[in-house]
A protein has these predicted regions:
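Conserved N-terminal phosphate-binding loop of PLP-dependent enzymes in the Aspartate aminotransferase
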Residues: 1-388
């Protein structure tokens, strides 16, 4: 009997250890892990520089209250600010906390300038921003909110890719538009660059803040440090998590000077956010991923992967409907049963995970090797042949 709550439908497999792109199960099997904790282990399992960072910091200081200065946090905040649009950073522990904090930052900004009624957040219907109460109501998904009433108010929703739907939902009380630059759980849907630029124009015209959720698609996952960079758009607020910790729990809200002005002492806090252990790991991750050569390689390997997947799609059009994504955030939309496909991949020692719209989500580590991509392509092709 397991004493864990039943809120996960766990597969009957557990792992003893991981190394790089691979996981080793307790029953002695080796798996190519293209889930990586759902885009968390950005540098694979047990990366030596991250292991060293944890070991080194663990011998000095694990935790200290944010009532005091934390040099490791100051260092990571500076690196993030220098690399991005941000002027200020506020650390959390997870993606859901980061999106919740982003909502607070947006509402608090308008409150601080004498517009307390300007507090509504406009989001994409059936998006994903986390599992906390505000985050599930921000998603606009009945599946996520069922049974968790009363409703958390202050959110409006528009259809993905429908600018007319968006414009109709904007009111004088709209504080921010919050979207995932690439929808992950929603089926690997990339918001086009022109669309992001249009969102920025709308926000500028209507005095609305732009929040771009990069919890899953950020920190090099797209081939750029942030997925929105290609569009040249500057958001006001960006929540991040997952990849910045390389497997260690870290979340953060990046914000410009204007919106940060509302976050005065006492307006938000986090007991564990920005702790020295997490910051030590985050600094190591930043040093590796922010390197131009590293990001260039992510783009190169992802182009190679996508081209090979599209060849499989052309060979098995009855199985694969579409290959989509950017960088190493890839979706295979199927014409066949998703659960069965993922199970067959797993039977062939390749781990993947589902997304909405019958999509198989593929999330290799950003430092994945070419021969590991080749191995995965071979397995995917084999499964397509079996199901054809």
């Amino acid at each position: 009997m397991s004493y864990l709550a039943k809120n996960y439908n766990r597969k009957k497999i557990s792992f003893k250890y991981g190394k790089g792109s691979f996981l080793y199960s307790t029953n002695g099997k080796k798996y190519l892990d293209f889930v990586q904790g759902i885009a968390v282990n950005s540098l694979g399992h047990a990366h030596p520089k991250l292991v060293n960072a944890v070991n080194k910091q663990s011998k000095k200081l694990w935790h200290v209250s944010n009532a005091f200065q934390i040099p490791e946090g100051e260092m990571l905040a500076k690196k993030l600010a220098k690399k991005t649009f941000a002027d200020y950073v506020m650390f959390q522990n997870s993606g859901a906390e980061a999106t919740e904090a982003a909502i607070k930052v947006a509402r608090r900004y308008f409150y601080s300038i004498g517009k307390p009624k300007k507090n509504r957040i406009l989001c994409v219907k059936n998006s994903f921003h986390g599992r906390t109460l505000a985050a599930i109501y921000a998603s606009g998904s009945k599946k996520m909110t069922e049974g968790f009433g009363p409703k958390v108010g202050g959110f409006d929703h528009f259809e993905f890719g429908n600018h007319q739907s968006l414009k109709k939902k904007i009111t004088k009380n709209t504080a921010a538009i919050m979207v995932e630059t690439i929808m992950g759980e929603g089926g690997i849907k990339v918001i086009p660059d022109w669309c992001l630029r249009e969102l920025r124009k709308i926000c500028n015209k209507k005095n609305i803040l732009l929040i771009l959720d990069e919890v899953q698609c950020g920190i090099g996952r797209s081939g750029d440090f942030f997925a929105f960079e290609k569009s040249k758009v500057k958001p006001d607020i960006v929540p991040i998590a997952k990849g910045i910790g390389g497997g260690f729990p870290i979340g953060a809200v990046l914000m410009n000077k204007k919106v940060a002005s509302g976050m005065t002492a006492g307006t938000h806090g986090s007991t564990f956010g920005g702790n020295p252990l997490a910051m030590a790991v985050g600094n190591s991750v930043m040093d590796i991923i922010s390197n131009k050569k590293f990001l260039k390689n992510v783009k190169s390997i992802s182009e190679y992967f996508l081209s090979n997947l599209k060849k499989i799609q052309n060979e098995y059009p009855k199985i694969i409907k579409e290959i989509r994504g950017r960088g190493l955030l890839i979706g295979i939309e199927l014409k066949t049963d998703q659960t069965k496909f993922i199970k067959k991949l797993m039977d062939n020692n390749l781990l993947t995970i589902r997304a909405a719209e019958n999509v198989v989500r593929i999330l290799p580590p950003l430092n994945v090797k070419k021969n590991e991509i080749d191995q995965s392509v071979k397995i995917i092709k084999k499964v397509c042949l079996e199901l054809n």
